[in-house]
């Protein structure tokens, strides 16, 4: 009963040891014994909630069907609809394995495509491959070596840059596209190898020389350039190698010969060696409104390769979100990013900026305890507080107090998902709350394929 009152925005004052006064209040011959203490003006919305059969679910004007609530009313959601309590279209999906997260995610992706948005997803289990092919999308298995994202092709991290955003990575504070990308590359190379500051500064100097060699400056019109117009990692390696072979101590360079040698040794595998098949090449991903990056094989790769590849994919997503716009980036199994705290910072700052271009991010994960650890707890909290649209399934065996604190749940809200209910979740939409039973129309279910989430 208390849960229903809370959902109807009716606050409850518990009258302990006041039965006699309560009886007088409701008795035909009694009087209002609590009037002076508890009487207040009742809002019209609360009065309306007292009427029977007043509930109509959620019916956004341009919304798409995602299921029914516990009363049987339809839930139609338009994620782009802004309100005082919904300032972006970012989405969060959390829950234990087997509760229906993948099913909901596939339904939301199809709805977003139907609404006219482009979608880029990171598929950790290759669950979306059949659906991608069914709707004419592009499935790119990054470990197969067929598709490539050129690391040295400048990507946008912020359309204007805010030098005062001291809590953001350096790439978000630069004002020009080339400066943003060089700042990103410094973090990228750190993710690949444990380079010192001196190594990174040397690489930065070499990058500046490389872009000048290819005629790329701050004033370059990048919209007119083709993927093949940009340098690739082997070009960077050749430039550094030339600097090393022709090093002249009498010129008093900012970097030493030994530094160049160590940088060459650290970058050899990525530029010329075994890892070059994943990084060294021009971007050749087909233009598609639905692009799925298959990263299943990446999860078993070496940690440095995995971190660098995830960083590279994140840069591609950010560029589409902030330059093309009207795009949704979906990151499934968010926990795989936790091995790289810098990547978490980039995701957090993307969440804050994508709304400017009518874009959004969809984050999904299961083991919430992975995010509640020393060293990453403060970085991951915004990932759960920024999205105004949250779909919370049963979390399994987890500490109740920390779960409620991290997701800012009330006791009554937690009780709704305390026990496993396959396909049922708590849908938090700004200040609105719905106990949602996820249902997809039959014609959309046929597109889901035979993998997870069917």
Predicted feature residues:
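P-loop NTPase motor domains
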Residues: 10-11, 22-75, 81, 124-138, ...
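A short beta-strand-to-loop transition that corresponds to the Sensor-1 phosphate-sensing loop
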Residues: 125, 364-368, 395-397
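Accessory regions of macromolecular translocation/handling assemblies
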Residues: 1-37, 75-81, 85-105, 109-110, ...
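Short regulatory helix/loop adjacent to the ATP-binding pocket of P-loop NTPases
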Residues: 130-135, 371-385
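Conserved beta-strand edge residues that scaffold enzyme active sites
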Residues: 19, 126, 146, 368-369
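Walker A/P-loop NTP-binding active-site region of P-loop NTPases
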Residues: 99-151
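Conserved AAA+ ATPase "SRH/arginine-finger" region at the nucleotide-binding site
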Residues: 141-144, 389-398
